[in-house]
Amino acid sequence: MVKYLFGHVTTESTSKTINVVASSKTKLVGENQGIPNSPQKTIALTAAVGKMVYLDIEVDNEIFRCLGTVTDIKTHNLMMTSQMESVGAKETAGALPKGEDFRKLTFSIQATFNRPPGETKWKKYSSALPTSPETRTAVYFLDDETVQEMVDEDDIYPTVGFFRGLDTAPQPLAIPDFGGNTGATHSAVIGRSGSGKTATYTYILGTYMCHEHHAIMVIDPQGQWSNENGMVMSLQGMAESLGRPVSVLRVAEDIKLPMDEEIFSRMVSKLNLWKKFRRMGTENLEAFSDAVASGIANLPYSEYDKPPRDLLSKVFGSIANSSSALNRIYTRGDRQDAFRDDLLRLAGLPIIDPDTGEQALVSKEDEEEVEKNWEAILSVFSPLINLFSSTNIDGGKRHSLGGSYGFLKDVFQVRNANSGPAPYVILDMSPSTKIHAAADLMGGKDAGLNMQKILDNQDVKALILMMVLDEMKRASETAFATTNTGNLNTQIVFDEAWRFAPEGKATPEIEELAKKLEGFALDTRKFGIGWSYILQSPADLKTGIWRQLTYVYVGYGLVGDDVKRLEALTDDVKQLDLYRQFIPPKSTGIYPFMLMGPVSPIIFTTAPAFVNVFNNNQDYLHYNSSWINKITERRSMPRITVEKLDPNRRVKTPKQKAVQVEKQYSVGNAKTVSTPQTTIKEPVVSKKIIDDDPDLVEDMPF
């Protein structure tokens, strides 16, 4: 075994901190170091800061091995006394005696293993040595072979990159499984744009798949995880290749939202649905939105599948004929009467003169005004009510999240040894590619193609997320209550968390969602549901959530107060000096990350681990091949290739598709329907579409 000698223990070392003196010019490489007459040679001194080192000592016939990280190093020279330095300030450097440089440092012990006499396996011992080491004890650089000695070969330790400064030694990770009695843990990945945080967490999520019963659900506000555009690796391809069910659920197309009267009313108000119908005060508008939401919520769900104009006409007529509803909107008689007449015109109902009892005549100008109002209202209401209907705007089927037949029943389950692999699910909150393309072609004017405007509204998206989270909470509580055999073992990843779970002032909808997320993190952990948040700064995350985090993965770019906030997560703040030395990945192509929390099996303290994240899928597959191949072999599946993890191979070419676009033109109560043919380019963006068009895909991973 080759060891790379770094230096030797010097005086004043303790059982917790080791003082080391290293040569300033060379280091020794020896075969069987420590054995007399073993071969040795010298090589050039290499960088030391940021690398892990170790030493062995013998106590009571047992071998103890401690490990630590070099955080800084200082140069010394016994000839360079303060007096000589003063002389050197006035004379040339050549006039000074050279002496001999040496380097000195102190590192804190982060883990200690022991090996009893006669045994070959190392055991975890403590975060300190049983005694201080002798001076001149050799200190070596950590290498891959030594790491493999330390970890139990029976345990699964995936990896996402190399030890910092050791490009041949992968950093093993103790990836937690949430199926035990301890419950789940929460985590966050943080870094500025370009730090590689999405790529890093893509690899981390891939390593979680070593636990076959660990379900993963990604809440995807922008559609990045569903379409995998710009991703370093296809997690969908990874999951499929490991035998996991994969689902991409798009709010715009696939999910039928549960009707919530209060939230629907707030959506209507946020979308300013009535702005072209009538000028109304804020309180009047809110009361009207409440009345409409109440009317819709009290209708059977089957009504939501009817033409939006028919549905809303029925609600308008009900409000117009309800004195109590009108009184809540307007108290003044003249305004109330005028408002009632406007509703009756929109509903296509007769207006009766209270004095004569005769039906008021409807002029051509009135009819034209009604149609203009309907066009403005339906441009917003049609896509909004479609989120609650059984079919999407393209005629595809929507399904509920909750209930016995909802999507979530396959996510929140207590799994056992006989269960199949847990699913990988992406909940896409963005407008779908189809809807974007069609809306662009139609100039955004068609009422059925304005879903983009709704789902691009951050406050409306927050309201939708509230409904989704409530469904998730109900489904998880039901699943957990129906069994006493274990936890739900699920991880929920929340991308763009800084938008929806911020600390500080935001819109009422965002603040309410953030508070709800804080409560869910606390309540669902005991069910075995862990949350992971992707954001740019620790200050962007609500404090109540931040305090619940067990793991924090930090990429390049944090400064000032953000770094100070990280100090509370470790008892060795000197380690953060290594983080401050990170350089922009854009300039090097290397993505350094600091992993905080009990993530490394060879660190027993709160000190972070440092890793250079893989920048290619070939390395990821190679260094994770042990656990990946065990799964594929057990399930009689082919081995995973680099090509199967390429996110850019999922689509062969854009597809030309004829889309039926229905426009309705109304004159009075008569309607004329025309169905022009429109051709749009539509990328294949979901498994549903791929199933319909198998010729579009070559060598797909599912």
What are these regions (language model features)?
Residues 588-702:
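Conserved P-loop NTPase motor module
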Residues 159-253, 565-572, 625-635, 644:
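Glycine-rich phosphate-binding loop of nucleotide-binding enzymes
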Residues 113, 222-226, 431-434, 498-499, ...:
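Conserved nucleotide-binding/hydrolysis micro-motifs of P-loop NTPases
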Residues 79-80, 225-230, 257-258, 500-502, ...:
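Switch/connector loops and helix/strand junctions flanking conserved nucleotide-binding motifs
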